[in-house]
Design a protein with these regions (language model features):
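Small-molecule-sensing regulatory modules
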Residues: 1-139
Length: 139
């Protein structure tokens, strides 16, 4: 028997269990999985400033790139689309996968650390791979 849980849940519940992380090549996570978004009214300047102080720029960049893929592919909450970006000092790593229930297409690539279009480029690569594999999703 097995169950899939977020690692944060295991940590938060202080569970002493044996577990392993899923390889994103096997199961690409949902876009922006695990990212907490907070919004505030523009006229609440003290709240906006407090949020800016705790904002994680790397995570924000990763979420932005993942959203680029979702928009370019035409995905949404019910799309069988996984996207993951990791930004570090050496560059940007992106992986995206999509499935029709029988077949799966996964693409990945490295980008320059300042490439703000990495999400668009990965989406284009995924579309090309989908076309090559004959993978067409119903709208």
């Amino acid at each position: 028997d097995a169950i899939v849980l977020a690692e944060a849940s295991i940590t938060r519940m202080n569970l002493d269990v044996k577990y392993f992380r899923l390889d994103p090549h096997i199961m690409v996570p949902e876009p922006t999985q695990g990212i907490i978004a907070v919004i505030a009214r523009k006229d609440r300047k003290e709240v906006v400033e407090a949020l800016k102080a705790i904002n994680d720029e790397r995570t924000y960049a990763e979420a932005t790139l993942e959203r680029q893929v979702v928009v370019d592919i035409g995905g949404g909450c019910h799309s069988p689309l996984g996207v993951l970006f990791r930004v570090n000092d050496n560059g940007i790593y992106g992986i995206a996968g999509i499935s029709d229930g029988r077949r799966k297409v996964v693409v990945e690539d490295w980008f320059e650390v300042d490439d703000s279009d990495a999400g668009h480029k990965l989406a284009k690569k995924l579309k090309e791979a989908m076309k090559s594999e004959g993978l067409i999703l119903k709208a």
